[in-house]
Amino acid sequence: MISSSVKFLLNDKLIVIKNPDPNQTLLNYIRTELKKTGTKEGCSEGGCGACTIVLGELVDNKIEYKAINSCISFVPTLNGKQLIIVEDLVSQNGKLHPVQDAMVKFHGSQCGFCTPGFVMSLLDLVFQIPHSIIMFLYLFHPGVILLIEVVK
């Protein structure tokens, strides 16, 4: 039986979507229903990464995070998960997340359209790094080399 609602966390707030459209993409939902336009639509087929978001899921009493392409994932995918979008990374006092700060500090964007997707992919990488490891990451993009020091 298909559930008549989708429940997920956004900014530590429980969101309930009643009678969700199973054909609505996460990208469309984020941009039209949540009115958050930081997540971009590029290719609409999961190839460019401009639409990257991060989902958290409780697995064996631990939250596992995974970057996904929101343009090819659908609203029911959110059920029981935590949604993290680029707008959620800035703290309430306006301080940038370390990944965002590094993008600014090292001039890690060009026109800026794909930058939210880069930031979310890097955030996913930060979640995947074991505790207490320092990693230097070189992100190559045409004309740009970004060096980020990630410390957990």
Q: Which residue stretches match the model-derived regions?
A:
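Signature of N-terminal electron-transfer/Fe-S-associated modules in redox systems
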Residues: 1-152
